[in-house]
């Protein structure tokens, strides 16, 4: 009696297609509002900050959370924790400039300190909330991990000062959080 064997490539294809069909059939995935893109920075010659935005799965009036990764120089785009989307609108920003998909063609646009990075992020937030005015009234939280612990307080201070001086759109800053461990351990994936 002959034995039937399957090749490894065949098994891989079967696994991939089984994952695709379950992903495409999941309404929580296909209904997920998201977009990505670049915002120009007014204090730069050619810098563009890349962002990835996901709408809350629950309610569009949920808080807005910006996630900043550590590094410095680690892309925020690789930290996609689905549990955040159950309770918030989530923004990932590749920062500082020349991190991830963010770029600049002029070396004078590179930032080397928290104040400059926080100015860029503040300008990014002004552009983001101008494009999404319905989110500007929602509570706003800054969170991240690792080296982002340097950027988070600087950005919170910058947002607070910008609000006090009425420099632009008022950002409804509430609380900041710096994870001492990775967010996988901090938030449940369920």
From Swiss-Prot:
Pfam families: Peptidase_S10
GO biological process: proteolysis
Disulfide bond sites: none
Cross-referenced InterPro entries: AB_hydrolase_fold (IPR029058), Peptidase_S10 (IPR001563), Ser_caboxypep_ser_AS (IPR018202)
Protein origin, superkingdom: Eukaryota
Cellular localization per UniProt: Secreted
Primary location group: secreted
Keywords, ordered alphabetically: Glycoprotein, Secreted, Signal
CC terms in the record's Gene Ontology section: extracellular region
Glycosylation sites: 58-59, 105
Signal peptide: 1-25
GO molecular function: serine-type carboxypeptidase activity
Family according to the record: Belongs to the peptidase S10 family.
Protein name: Putative serine carboxypeptidase-like 54
